[in-house]
Amino acid sequence: TTIISLLSRFYDPTNGEILVDGKNIKYVDLYSYRSQMGIMLQDTFLFSSTIMENIRYGRLDATDEEVINAAKAVNAHEFIMKLENGYDTEVNERGSRLSLGQRQLVSFARALLANPRILILDEATSNIDTQTEMLVQKGIEKLIKGRTSFVIAHRLSTIRDCDNILVI
């Protein structure tokens, strides 16, 4: 929580500095910085709307095709198409009609569609079964490729492909 709060600039460090891509984040405009950020927490949040709109929330001007491509890229498309109304399936606030893994896949699709420069994943696979974890892992691989990513995890499988690993 402390690391996420510092990286997200909910507060600044009392000593030292935090560099992202070699730049001290204290001197970056807060709105600009946060608009380039995607944060995925252990407890995903879905809005009371359709799956299509929940993914589109990542980038409001996205076309249906772009939303579907994002879902395909993180392995969410298959389960979405098995739902009674596909992408038009209504989900309750917090996504209670979906499993934890399905909610996380929808959130990954949203994050991929938003295309943030900086990604923070906090225990993104902690509450899911092994089979769903494999799907989510593939989604994570696509999500972190080519961007600065901070992955906070207890499972080695979640961080095995990271360039640098810090153990705290």
Give the positions of each predicted feature.
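Conserved ABC transporter NBD signature motif
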Residues: 16-23, 33
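ABC-family ATPase nucleotide-binding domain "signature/switch" substructure
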Residues: 2-8, 35-43, 51-54, 70-76, ...
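Post-Walker A helix-loop "phosphate-sensing" segment adjacent to the P-loop in P-loop NTPases
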Residues: 12
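ABC-type ATPase nucleotide-binding domains, specifically the catalytic core motifs of the NBD
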Residues: 56-64, 78, 114
